[in-house]
Amino acid sequence: MAGQEQQSSSPREEEHEVADAPVPVPSSPQASAHTDGVDDLLDEIDGVLESNAEEFVRGFVQKGGQ
């Protein structure tokens, strides 16, 4: 096996063509409002977790045979 070279069946010159990246579409006011609502919700969750994460997690822990 020493001295044997493996040859690829496809030539190296043919590289995979890279697809053009999609052009970002300007967001509509409705989409922007939706994103703002999600951001507000995530900020609220972050606030709850920062202030009382232990209590928040305890609410999801199973107790006994529940």
From Swiss-Prot:
Region (ARC ATPase binding): 23-60
One GO term (biological process): protein pupylation
Metabolic or biological pathway: Protein degradation; proteasomal Pup-dependent pathway
Region (Disordered): 1-39
One MF term in the entry's GO annotations: proteasome binding
Keyword Iron belongs to the record: no
Subunit composition and interactions: Strongly interacts with the proteasome-associated ATPase ARC through a hydrophobic interface; the interacting region of Pup lies in its C-terminal half. There is one Pup binding site per ARC hexamer ring.
Name of the protein in its database record: Prokaryotic ubiquitin-like protein Pup
